[in-house]
């Protein structure tokens, strides 16, 4: 169901990580924002802190059941772990919502 969109997200993340990662290494920076809601289908923010990843998900209507949403979120974690070459236990997530 969401596999085609995951490929789009994967491609975007690879492109951004290549560019920003190279720039950060050159400048000796370990903490930076990698992704900030670039694609509307992925309302998340990804920040790198050395070997740790902080993922913020923006709460919004997504039209998915809770079960499908959990599968989607797990798939997002897998894509991030694959591209950054980290295990998923180094990815910390939070749901952000308006008060």
Range-by-range predicted roles:
Residues 5, 9, 68-76:
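Short amphipathic alpha-helical segments
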Residues 39-41, 66, 70:
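N-terminal, helix-rich and Lys/Arg-enriched segments in bacterial and organellar proteins
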Residues 45-47, 71-99:
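Non-catalytic substrate-recognition/targeting regions of SAM-dependent transferases
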Residues 57-67:
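A short interface-forming secondary-structure element
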């Amino acid at each position: 169901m969401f596999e085609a969109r995951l490929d789009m997200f994967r491609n975007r993340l690879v492109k951004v990580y290549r560019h920003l990662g190279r720039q950060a290494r050159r400048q000796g920076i370990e903490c930076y924002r990698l992704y900030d809601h670039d694609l509307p289908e992925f309302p998340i923010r990804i920040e790198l802190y050395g070997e740790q990843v902080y993922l913020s998900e923006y709460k919004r209507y997504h039209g998915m059941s809770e079960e499908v949403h959990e599968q989607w979120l797990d798939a997002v974690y897998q894509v991030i772990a694959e591209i950054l070459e980290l295990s998923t236990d180094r990815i910390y997530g939070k749901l952000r919502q308006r008060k």
